[in-house]
Amino acid sequence: MYYGFDIGGTKIALGVFDSGRQLQWEKRVPTPRDSYDAFLDAVCELVAEADQRFGCKGSVGIGIPGMPETEDGTLYAANVPAASGKPLRADLSARLDRDVRLDNDANCFALSEAWDDEFTQYPLVMGLILGTGVGGGLIFNGKPITGKSYITGEFGHMRLPVDALTMMGLDFPLRRCGCGQIGCIENYLSGRGFAWLWQHYYHQPLQAPEIIALWEEGDERAQAHVDRYLDLLAVCLGNILTIVDPDLVVIGGGLSNFTAITTQLADRLPRHLLPVARVPRIERARHGDAGGMRGAAFLHLSD
């Protein structure tokens, strides 16, 4: 059995999957915020309960926001303070007497989608998250590409390309990102960015769902706004696709529920790609909230 943990600032979620990649059991507990020992106990108790329930010693994978293992072997995860700065993988492997694998939550999202029955035919899968921020992951032959610093797939911190500035207007403000850089695409393409663009052009504070509702009603300003956003997304994604050249792009996050993104994006991409490039298949994520657990569990499938 494959045990997948999706760990965040408020909850530890465990999903148990069988060899057919089907969810058999899940359970959630609150994430301890202050005590590392309590954090380890919470994970180990869930593993022990799963082992007893299924009569086996399942493999353990964990998805967590942040850098799973820094150069000194410790975790960096600002949203999980009880475990940040601690050698989480080594400590859990020792306590559970098995190989525990960690990766960041965005890679686990991408891995979950790459192992979908419909998508396993594609060697190179790119996950793109358009949510509170912009991120994602790359999966090659069923295995995450992590890189030295676990920042592969941090697409949101690429800068706006020159033709995006031409498209949006020369007086378009370059916003400072939370990472400290200026002009990161996450500030324009995330759900927050979608709402910020509306306020910038129309001087009216609305949230993304409200703007999308106006678009669905045929509001002219909302139609123009969505058209502008999709063009901006296409030019930024075109840069990424020129580097990565995936077979499939799977889009997750809150904005993935807006069908215009997956239905219209492919038609806008060719003019932002090399003439010989083929537009990849673009799909909405299939597994929703379960994706984090699925992807973490499947960190052991690539063996």
UniProtKB/Swiss-Prot annotation:
GO terms for biological process: N-acetylglucosamine metabolic process; peptidoglycan turnover. It comes from the Bacteria. Keywords: ATP-binding, Carbohydrate metabolism, Kinase, Metal-binding, Nucleotide-binding, Transferase, Zinc. PROSITE patterns: ROK (PS01125). The keyword Kinase applies. Pathway: Cell wall biogenesis; peptidoglycan recycling. Its EC number is 2.7.1.59. Zn(2+) binds at H157, C177, C179, C184. HAMAP family: GlcNAc_kinase (MF_01271). This is N-acetyl-D-glucosamine kinase.
